């Protein structure tokens, strides 16, 4: 192809990309807006669109089937509550590379015990930023997909979790066998019975979070990584409260059998406050991979830094 032809092709490709970006629409939800309910805007959206939701409480749920969709609140007090779609949860993400921002998802309860603020069933990267999860069975439940990435940034989880279902417990975050779970700058409080974070991902990252039972939380583990995988837990503040359902361990790794390749287990620069009144193990490692613990600080009751292979420094 001659230079002129190459230049024409390059310009055409740039123009096509620009047109694709320009074609993305913002669908507005709220009183006096084009859509009265988030679910209607989400159903009408196309790939790459933004659904912008005005403050208010919406008794609504939705199934997301558009890739690269952004669902965001336009101000404080955007609440989706009291309804679950397909017997699963409030937002069911069956698409790739979706972003959910600045919402509250509240009160997801379904008969099987896994009512989720967000049920992640798609691929690519699901980004959850600035979202509050309140009184759900699962805050976020991510289905098995080895190529999926779940990123949770600057979000809050209050009163999530349940062990009411005979089939097992629900958790504030429960990631199935996905590629990566990355939770950063988020806060967990008053988790009920289940774990604050349970991850079967190939790679689990928890950084700069606060995970606290408080006086009334009844969580089991603060962080559970039952099948191994690479782990980085850094810069967090953990607190086990007096009503914890499992006072013996804060972080558990590999107790259900190691099915993920496990090359690196690093737990550093965290603080554990033990308010249980019982001796507590900070990290219980049941994999064959040595855990590296460094710079961790323990307050309150008696804390055993590590059970299982690894080093403490």
Outline where the language-model segments fall:
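Bacterial N-terminal signal peptides that target proteins for export
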Residues: 1-9
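Bacterial N-terminal signal peptides
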Residues: 8-17
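Boundary at the C-terminal end of the N-terminal hydrophobic targeting segment
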Residues: 20-24
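Acidic Gly/Asp/Thr-rich repetitive segments characteristic of extracellular carbohydrate-active
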Residues: 26-60
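Residue-level detector of conserved, well-ordered beta-strand and adjacent loop positions
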Residues: 30, 54, 72, 81, ...
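Extracellular beta-strand-rich solenoid/capping regions of secreted or surface-exposed proteins
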Residues: 47, 58-71, 79-101, 106-124, ...
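Right-handed parallel beta-helix
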Residues: 68, 72-78, 96-107, 124-135, ...
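Extracellular beta-strand/beta-solenoid scaffold signature
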Residues: 82-91, 111-120, 135-144, 164-175, ...
């Amino acid at each position: 192809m001659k230079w002129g032809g190459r230049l024409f092709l390059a310009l055409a490709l740039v123009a096509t990309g620009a047109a694709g970006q320009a074609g993305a629409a913002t669908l507005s939800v709220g009183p006096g807006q084009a859509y009265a309910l988030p679910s209607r805007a989400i159903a009408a959206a196309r790939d790459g669109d933004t659904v912008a939701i005005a403050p208010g409480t919406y008794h609504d749920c939705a199934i997301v089937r558009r890739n690269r969709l952004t669902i965001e609140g336009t101000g404080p007090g955007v609440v989706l509550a009291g309804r679950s779609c397909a017997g699963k949860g409030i937002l069911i993400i069956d698409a790739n590379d979706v972003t959910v921002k600045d919402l509250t998802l509240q009160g997801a309860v379904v008969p099987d015990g896994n009512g989720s603020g967000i049920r992640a069933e798609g691929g690519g990267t699901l980004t959850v930023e600035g979202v509050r999860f309140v009184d759900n069975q699962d805050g976020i439940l991510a289905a098995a997909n080895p190529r999926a990435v779940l990123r949770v940034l600057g979000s809050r989880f209050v009163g999530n979790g349940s062990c009411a279902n005979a089939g097992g417990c629900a958790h504030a975050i429960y990631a199935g066998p996905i590629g990566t779970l990355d939770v950063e700058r988020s806060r967990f409080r008053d988790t009920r019975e289940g774990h604050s974070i349970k991850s079967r991902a190939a790679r689990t990252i928890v950084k700069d979070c606060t995970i606290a039972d408080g006086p009334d939380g009844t969580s089991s583990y603060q962080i559970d990584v039952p099948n191994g995988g690479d782990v980085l837990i850094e810069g967090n503040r953990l607190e086990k409260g007096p009503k914890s359902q499992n006072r013996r361990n804060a972080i558990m790794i590999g107790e259900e059998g190691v099915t993920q390749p496990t090359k690196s287990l690093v737990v550093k620069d965290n603080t554990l406050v033990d308010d249980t009144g019982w001796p507590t193990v900070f990290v219980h490692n049941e994999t064959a991979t040595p855990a590296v613990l460094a710079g961790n600080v323990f307050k309150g009751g008696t804390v055993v830094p590590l059970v299982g292979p690894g080093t403490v420094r």
